[in-house]
Every structure is written in C-alpha cells, then in structure tokens.
Amino acid sequence: MKPLNYAILKHFTKIKGACADDVIEALKGEYGNFKAFNKNTVMSALMTAETNGLLEEKSFDMDKSGNLRIYYHANDEGAATINNYIKD
C-alpha cells in the first residue's frame, strides 16, 4: 500500500481531472480507515502538488451546499514526473 499522498498523486495519472471529493470517493475503499484521510488533508495534498507543478487547476464549481470545488489534472509533464517517482 502506498502512502496516502502518493496514492492521491498516482490517482491523477489515471484520470482526466478530479476535485477533493472525487479523490476521497475513489480512494475510500483502500484508505477510508486512515485517520489522515479527510477532505482537509486531501485538499492540502492537491494544493501542494499544484504548487510543486505536478497538478494544475482545471476548473471549479459550487457543490449543492455552496462550497467551492476546485478540479485539478496532471498535465503531461506532471504525470510523467509522478510516474517516474511513484511506481505502480
């Protein structure tokens, strides 16, 4: 099992884009019991990956509760970097 942050990054090499809620839904089967597996931690990981050039903002919208959802994607260079350092 990969560390949670690695799993989050690796997830973006297999999809076209996602927000924190999508990531949580996709990884909850494997990481749902982890204490650190929550929206704040996932959002922090996404923002850190964006700051480091691994992910880019793709779009944004509001959920039914009026909360902002930011969608990210891994561009070709970011995905290549992630795949180079984090193996399946």
Descriptions of predicted regions:
Residues 5-12:
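Hydrophobic residues on short alpha-helical segments
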Residues 13-22:
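Short capping segments at the starts of secondary-structure elements
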Residues 21-33:
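DNA-recognition alpha helix
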Residues 50-61:
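A short, conserved structural fragment
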Residues 59-70:
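Short, Lys/Arg-rich nucleic-acid/phosphate-binding segment
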